[in-house]
Design a protein with these regions (language model features):
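Histidine-acidic metal/acid-base catalytic patches
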Residues: 1-118
Length: 118
């Protein structure tokens, strides 16, 4: 069994971003994070709203860094996306931007790690 880790949901619960890191620290080493999707929110239940990655409760770089160092080897994708004018119903433009953002974070972390070892 494993957890579909909704990073945005953990962030919007009371405790905010701390919930994300607690979950990574607990489930990551146990290899129970099998799939993760990332969205950002500002605020917590009952008053929160979805926002673009990097504009909300958590630092996306820190989350991806901790995921990569926890033993997570599953899928990491964007989740719900904020709408922008001129985009299609499914938010293709924002999904593309979120995917590029996440990929950029992963590449930056990998390059940073390679520089440490050089």
């Amino acid at each position: 069994w494993g957890l579909l880790f909704c990073i945005g949901t953990f962030s919007q619960m009371e405790g905010g971003a701390r919930n994300i890191f607690d979950a990574i620290e607990y489930f990551g080493p146990r290899k129970k994070l099998v799939y993760a999707h990332m969205r950002d929110v500002q605020g917590t239940v009952p008053r929160f709203r979805e926002c673009f990655l990097g504009e909300g409760n958590f630092n996306p770089f820190e989350v991806v860094y901790k995921l990569m160092h926890s033993g997570f080897d599953g899928f990491l994708v964007s989740d719900h996306v904020s709408g922008i004018e001129g985009d299609r119903e499914w938010g293709h433009k924002v999904r593309y931007a979120d995917t590029a953002y996440i990929k950029g974070l992963m590449e930056a972390i990998e390059k940073m790690e390679a520089m440490k070892q050089a």
